[in-house]
C-alpha cells in the first residue's frame, strides 16, 4: 500500500473522536484506498455491504416490562439480526432496506447459520443506540447482527454459547462467501 495509507493505524471505536465512526476518518480512508486503485471512493462505498457487530437485548422473563415479546430476541435461538434500531421514535437510528435484510437472511440460511430477528425493546423504554447509522450515511448497506444479551448493562450479563458460535459463523460466512 501507499506509504501515506500504511501510516494510518487507527481503529474506529464507537462514534466519538477523530477516529470514531461519526468522524470523516473511515470515508477518507476508503477514498484514499480507492484512489490508489483507480476508483472513486463514493463508488466503493455505494457498492459495499456491512454487518455492524452489535449485541441485542434478549427478552428477560423476570423483567418483561421494557420488551415486546413477539418482537424480541431470545438466548439460545441464534445470532440476532436487527433490521432497525434507535430511540425516541426514529432518533439515532439505522433502518436496513428490505433488499439487504433479504440478502443477509438468505446468506445465513443457505450456510446453516441459526438466526433470529429482534428489536431492542419497546419504543422509548431506553437503549437502542447503534453505530450502523454512521455507516449507512456513507451509502453502505448495513444491518446490526450480534449476540442476544440477557440483562444487558447489568452487573451480571448472560449470553448463550450457541448464539456466540452462530455470530462467529455469521461473520465468517459474510467475509468468505
Write out the residue ranges for each language-model feature.
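Single conserved hydrophobic/aromatic residue that forms the stacking wall/gate
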Residues: 1-13
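Short acidic, glycine/serine/threonine-rich loops at helix termini
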Residues: 15-20, 61-65, 156-158
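Flexible, glycine/charged-enriched surface loops at secondary-structure junctions
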Residues: 7, 37-47, 108-122
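Active-site-adjacent substrate-binding region
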Residues: 62-63, 67-154
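Non-transmembrane, aqueous-exposed alpha-helical and coiled segments at domain scale
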Residues: 16-21, 34, 67, 93, ...
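A glycine-rich phosphate-binding loop feature that marks nucleotide/adenosyl-phosphate handling sites
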Residues: 10, 46-56, 121-130
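A glycine- and small/hydrophobic-rich beta-loop-beta segment
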Residues: 23-82
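His/Asp/Glu-rich mid-to-C-terminal helical/loop segments that flank catalytic regions of hydrolases
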Residues: 147-177
Amino acid at each position: 500500500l501507499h506509504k501515506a495509507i500504511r501510516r494510518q493505524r487507527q481503529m474506529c471505536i464507537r462514534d466519538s473522536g477523530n477516529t470514531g465512526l461519526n468522524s470523516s476518518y473511515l470515508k477518507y480512508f476508503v477514498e484514499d484506498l480507492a484512489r490508489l486503485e483507480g476508483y472513486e471512493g463514493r463508488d466503493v462505498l455505494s457498492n459495499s455491504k456491512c454487518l455492524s457487530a452489535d449485541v441485542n437485548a434478549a427478552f428477560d422473563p423476570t423483567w418483561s416490562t421494557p420488551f415486546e415479546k413477539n418482537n424480541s430476541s431470545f438466548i439460545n435461538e441464534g445470532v440476532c439480526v436487527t433490521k432497525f434500531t434507535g430511540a425516541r421514535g426514529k432518533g439515532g437510528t439505522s433502518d436496513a432496506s428490505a433488499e439487504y435484510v433479504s440478502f443477509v437472511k438468505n446468506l445465513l440460511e443457505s450456510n446453516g447459520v441459526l438466526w433470529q430477528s429482534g428489536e431492542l425493546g419497546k419504543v422509548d423504554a431506553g437503549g437502542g443506540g447503534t453505530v450502523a447509522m454512521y455507516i449507512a450515511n456513507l451509502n453502505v448497506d448495513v444491518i446490526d447482527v450480534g449476540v442476544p444479551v440477557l440483562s444487558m448493562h447489568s452487573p451480571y450479563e448472560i449470553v448463550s454459547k450457541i448464539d456466540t458460535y452462530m455470530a462467529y459463523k455469521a461473520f465468517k460466512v459474510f467475509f468468505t462467501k
